[in-house]
């Protein structure tokens, strides 16, 4: 019989919310008897935007804005049906993007 694995990938702009969500997922999975690997911090994606400060000219005067996307990876090995039900009922903050692969 092949091992089942659920891979959960979390993304957020704020690392505090991301870590809280990862802790909730890990705690829920451990409470229902599944084996956990993670949360593994993945590289932070950094997007840089450069814009002119003035509306028309003065190209030498520019302002830079950055957007950081923090990521975490959690693997749940051999999940039980209780684990899947508990994860479906879990309430996470709206600022966290969740990607689940079976």
UniProtKB/Swiss-Prot annotation:
Which InterPro entries does its entry note? Ribosomal_uS10, Ribosomal_uS10_CS, Ribosomal_uS10_dom, Ribosomal_uS10_dom_sf
Give GO cellular component annotations, separated by semicolons: ribonucleoprotein complex; ribosome
> Does the keyword field hold Metal-binding?
no
Which Gene3D superfamilies does the record cross-reference, listed alphabetically?
Ribosomal protein S10 domain
Which keywords does UniProt give here? Ribonucleoprotein, Ribosomal protein
Which residues form each disulfide bond in the chain? none
A single Gene Ontology molecular function, please? Answer: tRNA binding
GO BP field: translation
Name the domain of life.
Answer: Bacteria
Give one Pfam family. Ribosomal_S10
Subunit info here reads:
Part of the 30S ribosomal subunit.
- General function of this protein: Involved in the binding of tRNA to the ribosomes.
Tell me the protein family, please: Belongs to the universal ribosomal protein uS10 family.
Instruction: Report what the protein is called.
Output: Small ribosomal subunit protein uS10
Native organism is Lacticaseibacillus paracasei (strain ATCC 334 / BCRC 17002 / CCUG 31169 / CIP 107868 / KCTC 3260 / NRRL B-441) (Lactobacillus paracasei)
User: Taxonomy-wise, where does this protein's organism fall, top ranks first?
Assistant: Bacteria, Bacillati, Bacillota, Bacilli, Lactobacillales
């Amino acid at each position: 019989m092949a091992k089942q694995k659920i891979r959960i990938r979390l993304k957020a702009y704020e690392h505090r919310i991301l870590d809280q969500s990862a802790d909730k997922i890990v705690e829920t999975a451990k409470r229902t008897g599944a084996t956990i690997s993670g949360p593994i911090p993945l590289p932070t994606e950094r997007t840089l935007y450069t814009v002119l400060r003035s509306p028309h000219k003065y190209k030498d005067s520019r302002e830079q804005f950055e957007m950081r996307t923090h990521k975490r990876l959690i693997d749940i090995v051999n999940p039980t049906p209780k684990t899947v039900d508990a994860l479906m009922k879990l309430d996470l903050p709206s600022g966290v993007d969740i990607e689940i692969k079976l």
